[in-house]
Structure formats: C-alpha cells, structure tokens
Amino acid sequence: MNFTVIIPARYASSRLPGKPLADIAGKPMIQHVWEKAQQSGATRVVVATDYEEVARAVRGFDGEVCMTSSQHNSGTERLAEVIEKLAVPDDEIIVNIQGDEPLIPPVIVSQVAQNLQKYQVNMATLAVKIEDVEELFNPNVVKVLTDKDGYVLYFSRAVIPWDRDQFVQLGKADLSQLQLHQHYFRHIGIYAYRAGFIKQYVQWQPTTLEQIERLEQLRVLWNGERIHVELAKQAPAVGVDTVEDLEKVRSILSHV
C-alpha cells in the first residue's frame, strides 16, 4: 500500500534544544527516525522543519525536507503546511512520526497506515497495554479508552476507566497490590490520517477539552469524528524529551 510519512522536527525544544541534531551513534537523531520510516515501506518520507541546520542535515543523508513556519501551535498545523506545499492529494494516507522517536519500530509505522485503510476512518492510531501501576497513575502517560470495536471513546492523562471498587478498597498506600485489568491502555503518539482530513482539522478551533488535557487529538472527538485504535505489534522504546532520555537511547544504539 502507498503512504507518506511526515516527520515534524522542531529545533527549539524547551527541554532539549537542538535535539533533532543530537548525535546518536555517529548520526543526528533525525537521521535515525528517517531511516526507521524508510524501513517501514513508506512510499515517501518527508522531514518538516523550521530550522535551516536541520534541513541541511537531512539533505546531507539524501532525505527529502520541507521548510515550514516557526509559528505553528501544533505538529498537526505543521503537517497541514507540508501537505499544502507539496500538493498532496486529499486521499493520500499520511503517517505522522515524531522527530524524537529514533527507536520507533518500522512495523508499527506500516501498521498504523493499514489500520486507517482497513477501518475507513479519517484518523487512526495505536496503543499498548499498561501493566505497571506507576505508569497507570503517571499524568505524562496518556491513557486511551475504546469501545468494543476499537473506536476511541476518550483520551486522558487521568486513569480511565476508574476502577471504583478496587481503588476505594486499597487506598493510596496499597496501590502496588492493584490488579490491572485488560482495559488499561497507553496511547502511542503515532497517527495516520487522510491528507484532506488534516486540512479539515486545522480549520477547527481549539476545544475546551484539548486545552484542559493538553491533548490535541481530543479536537477530533469533539467535532464528532471517529479514531480507530489497534494494539501495536511492537511496543516502541523510549522517545527523547530530556537529556536523560537521550543518554538512554545512546546507550541502546551503541550496542546495536
């Protein structure tokens, strides 16, 4: 199947400035992400950046790059600009991979594109089971709840669903004894969309729920669209948000 991967790569990260160019095993981080996207079988891979040094690095390893505005409020707005500039057809499948995911498994890149095509929705994504109590209660871990057919009911940083009886009985001191049931899933931040839908998305105003949770995908649900979720065939390793994350990834890739 045909699909295009777009990799937004912002240089001005608040927690780790310049991270697309951070050296990992002799290559800039953005090159590792690009290579994983290439291995997925994508028809086309484009790096979207607002910084000339990142663009120069991408051209240096023969990657395709699209320069974008530095004024975007979200990664989705950056995607919309790329789609407009490259005149991508409305029915083209677009997979969005974050530029700080150098360990993303290529198999899940193709999986999310197939998920979109199979279920005939405008947006699809992936999740993995939560099996750790600390992860469940961590607000930096986004939880996703679906119906019986895998369509999203809600995304939240809070624990959903709330297991009233078990949580009340155990209390905070005994959370380690929780029996995590099969409905707890961690959302993986990889998306597939139709190009035309991305253009529609950026026409919608930000919504109350997305501003409260700081989760822009809630804008899709707010406007009545469906998102389909599948369990990822392979759980992705750590992304790079901090210096500590970067060192972990360097350690992993130094042994490959």
Curated annotation (Swiss-Prot):
The protein's enzyme class: transferase
Any Gene Ontology CC annotation: cytosol
Subcellular location: Cytoplasm
SUPFAM superfamilies documented for this protein: Nucleotide-diphospho-sugar transferases (SSF53448)
One BP annotation, GO: lipopolysaccharide biosynthetic process
SS bonds (residue pairs): none
Gene3D superfamilies the UniProt entry points to: Spore Coat Polysaccharide Biosynthesis Protein SpsA, Chain A
GO molecular function annotations of the record: 3-deoxy-manno-octulosonate cytidylyltransferase activity
Catalytic activity: 3-deoxy-alpha-D-manno-oct-2-ulosonate + CTP = CMP-3-deoxy-beta-D-manno-octulosonate + diphosphate
InterPro entries per UniProt: Cytidylyl_trans (IPR003329), KdsB (IPR004528), Nucleotide-diphossugar_trans (IPR029044)
Protein's pathway: Nucleotide-sugar biosynthesis; CMP-3-deoxy-D-manno-octulosonate biosynthesis; CMP-3-deoxy-D-manno-octulosonate from 3-deoxy-D-manno-octulosonate and CTP: step 1/1; Bacterial outer membrane biogenesis; lipopolysaccharide biosynthesis
Main location (coarse class): cytoplasm
Keywords in alphabetical order: Cytoplasm, Lipopolysaccharide biosynthesis, Nucleotidyltransferase, Transferase
Function description: Activates KDO (a required 8-carbon sugar) for incorporation into bacterial lipopolysaccharide in Gram-negative bacteria.
PANTHER family registered for this protein in UniProt: 3-DEOXY-MANNO-OCTULOSONATE CYTIDYLYLTRANSFERASE, 3-DEOXY-MANNO-OCTULOSONATE CYTIDYLYLTRANSFERASE, MITOCHONDRIAL
UniProt protein name: 3-deoxy-manno-octulosonate cytidylyltransferase
The species this protein was found in: Histophilus somni (strain 2336)
